[in-house]
From Swiss-Prot:
Key word Endoplasmic reticulum present: no
Quaternary structure note: Part of the tectonic-like complex (also named B9 complex).
Organism: Gallus gallus (Chicken)
Gene for this chain: TMEM231
Transmembrane segments: 23-43, 266-286
Residues making up the signal peptide according to the UniProt record: none
Reported function: Transmembrane component of the tectonic-like complex, a complex localized at the transition zone of primary cilia and acting as a barrier that prevents diffusion of transmembrane proteins between the cilia and plasma membranes. Required for ciliogenesis and sonic hedgehog/SHH signaling.
PANTHER family: CHST5 PROTEIN, TRANSMEMBRANE PROTEIN 231
Family: Belongs to the TMEM231 family.
Protein name: Transmembrane protein 231
Keywords for the protein's UniProt record, in alphabetical order: Cell membrane, Cell projection, Cilium, Cilium biogenesis/degradation, Glycoprotein, Membrane, Transmembrane, Transmembrane helix
Amino acid sequence: MAGVELFSHPALHTRYRAGLCSAAALALLLIAVLTYVPPLLVAYRSHGFWLKQSAYREQPTVRFRYELLFVATTGPGPGSFLAWSTFPAFNRLQEDRLRVPLLSTREEDKNQDGKMDQLHFKLELPLQPTEHVVGVQLILIFSYQLYRMSTFVMQSMAFLQFFSPVPGSQLYANGDLKLNQRQLLNHCGLDTRYNVSVVNGTSPFASDYDLKNIIAAYRDRNVTTVFSDSNPIWMTGRGANTPFIVNATIRYPVEVILYQPGFWETIKFAWIQYVSILLIFLWVFGRIKMFVFQNQVFATTPVSPVLPLSPVLSYKQHQP
């Protein structure tokens, strides 16, 4: 029997054969192209075919590093401030403007999942009766880590700043340490590019402790943390012998992390879109193929199966 089998269908009980260079074979090739290529074009042109970014939720592992830099403004003049930090080189530069505060900190794991959920921070700055605080600038340094996809480790900061024309007795802040991304994280591997100190605590130069320079260098990072408290509370009415107090609660919330998907995740996402469109084309062109071969639009050789005789009929035929 000449040719090769081009098409068969259980409902037709017939196989159709023709040569490889016949019109029927070329028609079958065209139908195959029209079945599989257009779904790919439709999925691609509908946008979102290739997954360029993805997201997941994770609570970061955050710990306070017990490193800070504190500046209290006491007047309008350029040298009217008191300062202290955990960096000895910075403290040596302050001379008579150095004032050592009393600190108390406590990190709390509220849901007992092994990760800290918030930091309670309190700073008490002793003041002379003639000294008044009209502004506060505070940098707190944290260790910030993500583990679910890639392992991302960095040193980050919370920056708290407030000024008032009225001298205060206490500044109260309560907010979240929010992750800020300008770049997607990797889907796997170890990323420690920002695991460096926010403040160069060993430098003897005053410019390295200038808050403007510290903030500018920190903002150059593609991944940072920002302390979000749009409504800090400034309290007034400090007693003559009472310290100025900074009282802050910094929460470590669950974050939505944006990352660059890996190869297999991208393929899986594209495959789902392609197959969902392909099923429609398979159904349509399957009916077209059945019509073409059943109605002999192109010349083929139908081959019908030879059904076996029934055992009863076979027995009767052999009876004498």
